[in-house]
From Swiss-Prot:
Region ranges (Disordered): 1-85
Major localisation: nucleus
UniProt subcellular location: Nucleus
Name by which UniProt lists this protein: Zinc finger protein GIS
Function: Probable transcription factor required for the initiation of inflorescence trichomes in response to gibberellin (GA). Mediates the induction of GL1 expression by GA in inflorescence organs and is antagonized in its action by the DELLA repressor GAI. Acts upstream of the trichome initiation regulators GL1 and GL3, and downstream of the GA signaling repressor SPINDLY (SPY). Does not play a significant role in the cytokinin response. Controls trichome branching through GA signaling. Acts downstream of the key regulator STICHEL (STI) in an endoreduplication-independent pathway.
UniProt organism field: Arabidopsis thaliana (Mouse-ear cress)
Database matches in SUPFAM superfamilies: beta-beta-alpha zinc fingers
Induction (free text): By gibberellin.
Biased composition (Acidic residues): 1-10
One Gene Ontology term of the molecular function aspect: DNA-binding transcription factor activity
Keyword Protease (UniProt): no
Disulphide-bridged cysteine pairs: none
One Pfam family this sequence matches: zf-C2H2_6
Amino acid sequence: MDEATGETETQDFMNVESFSQLPFIRRPKDKNPKPIRVFGKDFTGRDFSITTGQEDYTDPYQTKNKEEEEEEDQTGDNSTDNNSISHNRRFECHYCFRNFPTSQALGGHQNAHKRERQLAKRGVSSYFYHPDNNPYSYRHYPSWTNGPLTAARSYGGFSSGPKPSGYYTRPSYGSQLGLWRLPPRVQGVYNSNAAFTSNGSSSSSNSTLPLLTRSQTQLSSQVGGSAAQNRMSSYGYGLSPNVQDHVSLDLHL
């Protein structure tokens, strides 16, 4: 069979000694070959299939690598943009409007502002609780050193003069012990044991009594005695007999 013309040739097969001597006969080509579907695409011829396969076929690994490279480029650009933004960003304080490079520094600074405001609120509340006191002094105890010391102020009496600002102040723990203070001892003026003398004998002026002795059992039984001495003896103190009481007090009931 001639491949070019498609005509058959007659040959003598009786004298053939081996299969290699037999001619190789091919099937004639179809004029309209059937298309071959590969990866969802139809291929009709060998040459066309090779060209279309090379043009249309894409390696999935190559596409994946290209996508990863594009993503890396995008992330790199985003990271550079974020770094530039972070370097240019400043954290501003809401209280004093100062700028800080990091959020941690801003947080510590604003915590200090909050602490200062809490202390200021406590000071204002204590000032309104004790309105007569100086706002810059310690507010829980009376300041007895603001004015001249008198016997009436020291021993709880009533004085005609102006009272100090700490006179109405009460201790924070609710006790009245903080209001009683001993005056500075003057030599020869106050006799610490005048209310407890017996048989005309008195102890030395250097001896001191407790801070607060308000015993009513130690009242003087002498009716005609000095009113000031009776009043002072009720608190455990008395004046020396040789010293006159120069404090002008109204002791009439």
